[in-house]
Amino acid sequence: AASDVYKRQNEDRTFHVGAAFRYANIATGVVENNVLKTELDLGSSLETYVDATQDFLSAKLPWAKNVFDVGAEFLYKTDNFFTRGEYMYKHVTKERDDQALFEANLGSIDSWGSLEAWQKGNPLGENSFHGAYIEAGYKIFGDPYQYSNSDALLKGLNGRALEVVARYSYTGLNDLVEGEKYIPGRDQYYPNGILADYPATSLSVGGGNMHSATLGVNYSFNKFAQVMLSYTYNRLDRDKFQYDKNFHVLQARLMFQF
């Protein structure tokens, strides 16, 4: 993993941009037919601090092997205003022992006439996913916004202060193949839009796309206590939940730090 930040700063303004890269090789999993089957689980909860459920945004990637994460970020702040954002890209490649799996199926109902036919009926593809957010805040009264040089982050409110904030975020866990059809009763995509029992291996990943917009008000009593109110509208696009589209979240938090 590697990350870097470039910053320009004067007395009342700060601007920084950053980039990050991470690589992971998956070497754990479960053994099936004497073959190690790796898997990568992806998921995200709604933007709330009280429910970590990832049922609406989740995906499982069997045979995942190499994971590449690339990110970029920016932050700009003045004494009374800030805006920041981040973009994240994930690419996953897969790997498996086709020969061993093909031989393990010989003589069974799942057997194929040749390795090439087995590979055609059980295709293996790569997947890509995206995510991003942008946020802005305006301080109505209180001490100026402060920037942490050591952490490359905007510091929290310090002293009595009132701010309004707005945020938009996107999480994309859909990687769908054009023409494939999703059958809710089987929770499965079918190649070429054809409903078939055998073979029916799909390359589509329908983990869900979520757009979220938030408006909030934060009031700080002092550097130790703060109350935060926010409303978030979420829009879900996932074939598995065709009738679950709109989610509304109203939150209130009282935070103490010492």
Regions inferred by a protein language model and the residue ranges of each:
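Short, small-residue-biased leader/transition segments that mark boundaries at the very start
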Residues: 1-6
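Short, well-ordered alpha-helical segments in soluble proteins
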Residues: 7-8, 23
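Active-site regions of oxyanion-processing enzymes, predominantly non-cytosolic
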Residues: 16-18
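Outer-membrane beta-barrel translocator/channel fold
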Residues: 20-28
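Outer-membrane beta-barrel pore domains
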Residues: 31-258
